[in-house]
Amino acid sequence: MRRGRQRKSKEGREGEEEGRPRKPLDPEKARARTLQRAVKLLAAKPRSVEELRGRLLEKGWADEASVAYALSKLKEYGYLDDERFAFGFASYRVKQKPLGRQRLARDLKTRKVSKETADAALELVYQETPEEELITRAIEKRVRLRGRPATRQETKSLYDHLLRLGFSYDLIIRKVREASDAPEEDEGEA
């Protein structure tokens, strides 16, 4: 069951009866409507400036001028800030799952955050939680679930898994070697 406002049928829309096109909104109403839509989109989830711009323009009912007005108002009110968004997004993702710098940079690029802003946010996030600590957590979790890699195929599988998580090649090689060389703990000892 859908919640929210009921949509009127085509017969009930203003100006559309008898095949006439709808009247365009006056600029003031268009700006207010775009601002209202932007606030709803931000209430659903945090977004970057460009991501929000794209969402507002995608339906075609908002023009560039009213979108620019809405974005400037939201920045003025402090609701829209790419630096804060990038840092919050990156720290949340790292706390949820150990991810490497490359993966987070790619995710922020997908969210349309500028490279400079993303790099600054990643620098702060990885100062709090170093990448070495994250890759160690990722390896420990994988070993807990699948056991220590015994064959070349299992080692490659672990390596590929860490690459997908976005860790650098050199760091993966070093940590996988450390994990392979580490003596296995006896599970039967108490």
Describe each PLM feature range.
Residues M1-A190:
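An alpha-helical, amphipathic repeat domain used for nucleic-acid recognition
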